[in-house]
A protein has these predicted regions:
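Conserved acidic-Pro-Pro-aromatic motif
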Residues: 90-100, 174-281
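S-adenosyl-L-methionine
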Residues: 1-170, 179, 243-253, 257-281
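Conserved short loop/turn motifs at secondary-structure junctions
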Residues: 103-104, 146-152, 219-220
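A short, compositionally biased
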Residues: 22-27, 137, 237-238
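Feature marks short, surface-exposed loop/turn motifs that line or immediately flank catalytic pockets
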Residues: 46, 107, 134-136, 218-220
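Hydrophobic pocket-lining residues within nucleotide cofactor-binding pockets
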Residues: 80, 130-134, 190, 216
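Short internal loop-to-helix segment that lines adenine-nucleotide cofactor pockets
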Residues: 52-76, 138, 153-208, 220-226
Length: 281
């Protein structure tokens, strides 16, 4: 299967967006997908994906095969954006609660609106407009929310618009201290900031070994002052996790595999070496 570059996906999505807006009229509209209500803007990438029922992270829901749907358990969505994963996870794990974290004020406001449209799911979702970091030096702006309008501040490769982040920055370890439930799954989609997020949750991750679903965007890592090799080494040697693809097949030569990810991103499941029996190699 041909894997498109991020820029190619955005160009195709932009053409589709213009086509739909021309024929349907309104950019903003309420829709229902898989019995979940959304308020979307057809001029934005994630929203368009929801409208077309294209789930870029659809294989994340394979986690249902190995993760129990239990009371008093919690799943964490870091980089929740408008709720495209938070809401389906809440529907899929209807006995669990969801912690939904989005750093940009723009996307967070859209997330809250989408939760209001889903009152039953909302009861089990706790949201935070926090920037998750191990570094006290706060990142004030990040490229996020893929708007198809022209904007000179957009990222040169993935075309994300520059958005202001929350004034509140917290480590994952400190945030988790406030949660009185068992956390067995963490989803991380932070556009290159993966190492900082993992470091900020080092104590918790090392002790409790949650399953992690992570988006790897190697072309963005240098923007945050680290190399992809540093991230791989932290995962394999510091927190002692192995890499699996989204069909639960172990990635044996991670460095070689990741080196082939050029100007795009790829998702992985991470699982602690002590828990490898949960996956089939």
């Amino acid at each position: 299967m041909i894997k498109l570059l991020t820029s190619q996906k955005i160009i195709i999505a932009s053409i589709l967006s213009k086509f739909l807006i021309f024929f349907l009229g309104k950019k903003k509209r309420k829709i229902i997908r898989n019995k979940i209500n959304y308020l979307i803007d057809l001029n934005e990438g994630i929203d368009l994906g929801i409208f077309l029922n294209i789930k870029n992270e659809k294989k994340i829901y394979n986690i249902k095969k190995i993760l129990k749907n239990e009371k008093n358990t919690c799943l964490i969505d870091i980089g929740a954006n408008i709720g495209s994963v938070t809401l389906p996870l809440a529907k899929l794990f209807d006995r669990s609660s969801i912690i939904s974290i989005e750093p940009t004020k723009y996307a967070y406001n859209k997330l809250k609106l989408n939760l209001e449209l889903n009152s039953k799911l909302k009861k089990r979702i706790k949201t935070f407009n926090y920037f998750i970091s191990n570094n006290r030096k706060k990142v004030k702006y990040v490229h996020s929310s893929w708007n198809f309008s022209k904007d000179e501040s957009k990222h040169k490769i993935h075309f994300g618009s520059l958005k202001k982040t929350s004034d509140k920055s917290v480590s994952l370890d400190n945030l988790i201290k406030k949660i009185k439930k068992k956390i067995n799954f963490i989803k991380i989609d932070v556009d290159g900031y993966e190492l900082e997020v993992l470091k900020s949750g080092y104590k918790f991750i090392s002790k409790y070994r949650p399953i992690i679903h992570i988006e790897f965007a190697p072309y963005l890592h240098k923007n945050f002052g680290y190399s992809t090799d540093e991230l791989i080494n932290f995962i394999k040697k510091k927190i002692h996790y192995d890499f699996y693809n989204e069909n639960f097949k172990k990635v044996k030569n991670v460095a070689t595999h990741v080196a082939k990810i050029k100007n795009r991103s790829e998702n992985f499941f991470l699982i602690n070496k002590k828990d490898r029996e949960k996956f089939k190699d």
